[in-house]
Amino acid sequence: MVIDKSIPKATAKRLSLYYRIFKRFHADQVEKASSKQIADAMGIDSATVRRDFSYFGELGRRGFGYDVTKLMNFFADLLNDHSTTNVILVGCGNIGRALLHYRFHDRNKMQIAMGFDTDDNALVGTKTADNIPVHGISSVKERIANTDIETAILTVPSIHAQKVTDQLIEAGIKGILSFAPVHLQVPKGVIVQSVDLTSELQTLLYFMNQNHLD
């Protein structure tokens, strides 16, 4: 199967949603799904579904629908969801603690293997109820040196985000999901995905206000 390497970011962001939909269809024992069924489940139009799928070659035949099991496995391969991906969490404040207790592995094959915070944080040296150890940030390089961990969730205050990012990159981290509302400078080969809760809420309020004006 030929995959177009120049996949738009908007399409890339929908990949996990497609995977979730096909897993749901599979659980409901749906064998074939049309682009309209997929679109309705996603809250988008069927033309967007067909355009997204076109980047991955021939996923289905027009008029026959899409094989649910085949597509579920395809997206599992694409998202590397056949094997468990271990990640670390850096910053055990309110958001960080909530994420430490979130059971990623119940929904996907991802799990937080370790938490990190400032060396003097009271949580350092303890474990969560799910047996996740919390370490001091100064030990991050040695802690992940002999592991397969390349991904970090960053939930530190904005003023510390860049410094901690530099430490993570030096330790070998290649991907960062950042909750800090600042732009992070990273070298080529390191990917940052930002989650700005304030921005998302403001966007929601904007669209709500637009609805009131209509």
Swiss-Prot record:
For this entry, list what GO says about its biological process: negative regulation of DNA-templated transcription; response to redox state
Of the GO CC terms on this record, one is: cytoplasm
Q: Which residues bind DNA?
A: 17-56
Q: Which residues bind NAD(+)?
A: 91-96
> SUPFAM superfamilies given for it?
NAD(P)-binding Rossmann-fold domains (SSF51735), Winged helix' DNA-binding domain (SSF46785)
Spell out the molecular function terms from Gene Ontology.
DNA binding; DNA-binding transcription factor activity
Q: Which UniProt keywords apply?
A: Cytoplasm, DNA-binding, NAD, Repressor, Transcription, Transcription regulation
Task: Indicate where this protein resides in the cell.
Answer: Cytoplasm
InterPro entries membership: CoA-bd, NAD(P)-bd_dom_sf, Rex_DNA-bd_C_dom, Tscrpt_rep_Rex, WH-like_DNA-bd_sf, WH_DNA-bd_sf
- List, alphabetically, the HAMAP family matched: Rex (MF_01131)
Q: How does it assemble?
A: Homodimer.
Q: Which NCBIfam families does this chain map to?
A: PRK05472.1-1 (NF003988), PRK05472.1-3 (NF003989), PRK05472.1-5 (NF003991), PRK05472.2-3 (NF003994), PRK05472.2-4 (NF003995), PRK05472.2-5 (NF003996)
Give the record's family classification. Answer: Belongs to the transcriptional regulatory Rex family.
User: What PANTHER family would the database entry show?
Assistant: REDOX-SENSING TRANSCRIPTIONAL REPRESSOR REX, REDOX-SENSING TRANSCRIPTIONAL REPRESSOR REX 1
Q: What does this protein do?
A: Modulates transcription in response to changes in cellular NADH/NAD(+) redox state.
Q: Which protein is depicted?
A: Redox-sensing transcriptional repressor Rex
Record organism: Streptococcus pyogenes serotype M4 (strain MGAS10750)
Upper classification of the organism: Bacteria, Bacillati, Bacillota, Bacilli, Lactobacillales
Quote the gene name from the UniProt entry: rex
